[in-house]
Amino acid sequence: MTSREQLVQHVLQELQEAVESEGLEGLVGAALEAKQVLSSFALPTRRGGGPGPQVLEVDSVALSLYPEDAPRNMLPLVCQGEGSLLFEAASLLLWGDAGLSLELRARTVVEMLLHRHYYLQGMIDSKVMLQAVRYSLRSEESPEMTSLPSATLEAIFDADVKATCFPSSFSNVWHLYALASVVQRNIYSIYPLRNLKIRPYFNRVIRPRRCDHTPATLHIMWAGQPLSGHLFRHQYFAPVVGLEEVEAESAHPGPAPLPPPAKTLELLNREPGLSYSHLGEHSSVTKSTFYRWRRQSQEHRQKVATRFSAKHFLQDSFHRGGVVPLQQFLQRFPEISRSTYYAWKHELVGSGACQALTPTEELTKLPERQVAEGLGCSSTAASSPGVVFMQRAKLYLEHCIALNTLVPYRCFKRRFPGISRSTYYNWRRKALRRNPSFKPVPALLESGPPQPVPVGEKALLPWKGGEVGEGAAKATGGGPPAPRAFLPLRVPLSRWQRRLRRAARKQVLGGHLPFCRFRLRYPSLSPSSFWVWKSLARSWPGSLSKLHIPAPTLGRGSRKEAEEKEAGRNVIAAVAPPEGTWPMAASPGQDPNGQVLVMDMLATTKFKAQAKLFLQKRFQSKSFPSYKEFSTLFPLTARSTYYMWKRALYDGLTLVDG
C-alpha cells in the first residue's frame, strides 16, 4: 500500500470515528482536518501506470435499459466493488481502474460537509436536486415524497453524508453534484426510459460548483432491476464510455498512431468546407464528433461576425453623433446581450469615441491649459476628447457650486449624458468640501398659494435686474449674476405633457386617485407631484382665508414684512404633506429642485420599507411569497430587487430593524 493510499485510509477512519458523535460538529471538524491532508496532493490528471490492461466487459443489464435519447455509440461497462459503485464508476472513467474510488469518496464527503448550504439552498439546481431526492427512494411519484418538508430533507442529507464515510453505502443524487465539483467535470446523468414522471429530475447534465476551465463530461448511468414496462428500481451506477474507446482498448497497436483530435479540429478551422470522407482513416475522431465540431465552428464563426458588425455599428453611430437606444440596438442585433451593449457603450464613452457628446458653446471656450491643470497632466495627454469632455463636466459642476447653484443630476445629465451618477456625486461631494460656505440661492416667493407653472413658459426667461438678480449678486459677493450657460438646463414641456399633467392634477385634487393608481396611470410624473397636489387639496381653503385678511393699521414697511411672512407660511402649508404621510422641511429659502429630490427619496424609501417589511414577515412565518404574488402588491418593485432581498433573507440578514 502506497503512502497516498495510507493517507486516504487514515482520513476515512477519522471520518468514520467522527460519525459516532451527535450532530455534525465533530464531523465538520474532521472534514476540515481531512481537507488539509487531501490538499497536500491533487487528483491525477491522466491515467498512470496501473496494475495492467483492464478487461472491459459490457453490462448487459444496463445496456437493456440504455435510453434512446442518450448519446449514441456508447456502452455501459461492468464495474467491480460494493455499494452503489458510484465512485468506482468515476474512477474507472477517469483513470481506467477503481483504484482511486476511496479517495473520491473521502473528497466527496468533505465537499458535502463544507458546502452543505450550497447543495441544500444556494445552488441553481437545488429545487431540481431536492425533488430528485424526494423520489430517490421510490420508483414513482407519490404524495408522501412530494410533501416532505425541508427539515426532513436536511436530515436525509446529514444521514447520507454520514453513510458515505463507509464503502458499502448507497449514493444519492446529491453525491453526483458533489462528485462533479470534486473531479471538476460535468457529469451526464443517464436515466432509463422508466419512471417517466420523475425521470426529468435525474436525466440531466450536472455541472461542478466552480470550474476555471471548460470541463469535460463523464457519462454515468443509473442501472438496476426492471420491474415492469414503465418502472425500474435503481441499484447501482454504471460507467458509460464511447464505442471508439472500447475498440481502441481491444485493438492491437498499429504501426503508426493516429493524429490527435486537436489536429483534426485545427484542419477543420482552416478548411470550413472539409468533409469526413476526405479524412478517411487519418483521423481519430468519429463521424458524429467531426460533424458536431464542424457545426460548432460554423456557429462560432457566425457569432463572431455578428459581434463584430454590432460593435462597429455602435461605434459608427457614436461617431455620427447619435446614441443608439438599447431597444433599437436589440431589434437590429438580438443575439447581443444587454450587458454587452452597455459594456461597449461605456468603453466608447471612456475612450473618447463619443465625440458627438460635446458640451455647449460656453463650455467649449474653456482653455486647454485649464483642462490640463485640472487633470494634473500635460496638455498633450489632456487633448483626448473623452478626457477633455469629462474635465469640462467637472469644471462646470465646480463652477456652479462656487456660484451657490446646486445642479440636480437630471439637469446635469442633459448637458453631459456620458457621465454616470456615481461620478457626478463624487465630483459634487469634493466640490462641496472645497466650498464650506456653500448655501443655495433662496428662491423667489410670491404672496399666495403656489400655482403649477409650465416649465417652458417661465423657467427659460432670461434673468433681469430685480430680486433674483440682487439675490444672485449677493450670493456671488456683489459681482455679476451667474452666466446663463451654468444654469440648470430646463427643457420645455410639450403640449401633451401639459395636458397629462393638468389631468393628473385635477384627479388628485378631486381626491379620486390613490397613489398606487397614480403611479400606474402616470409613470412619467414624479411621485412628489402627487403629494404636493394632495397637500394643496387639503390646505387650499386655509391659505385663501389667510390671504384675504386685511391689515389697514399697518404701515408700508410693516405691511411688506407681514406679507412676506404670510407668503412663507402659505408656501410651507402648501408644500407640506397631510398628517400620516412623510415629513418634509420646506422653507422659503429652500431650492425647489432639492424639495422635489427630498420628496422623491422619502416616497421611494417608504415604499421600499413596506415591501421589505412584508417580505420579512412572510419569511418569518414560513410562507414566503412568490414574485407573482409580490408584484401584485408592489408592482413598482423590480424583479431583481425582489430576488436580492430574498437572497439576503435566506442568507440570514435582516431587511428592516424592529
Curated annotation (Swiss-Prot):
| Family assignment from sequence similarity | Belongs to the vertnin family.
One annotated GO molecular function is: DNA binding
In its UniProt entry, what is this protein called? Vertnin
The membrane spanning regions, by residue number, are none
- Keywords per UniProt: Developmental protein, DNA-binding, Nucleus, Transcription, Transcription regulation
- Relate the protein's function as given in its record: Acts as a transcription factor that regulates development of thoracic vertebrae.
Q: Could you give one GO CC term from the UniProt record?
A: chromatin
| Compartmental location | Nucleus
Instruction: List the GO biological process terms.
Output: regulation of transcription by RNA polymerase II
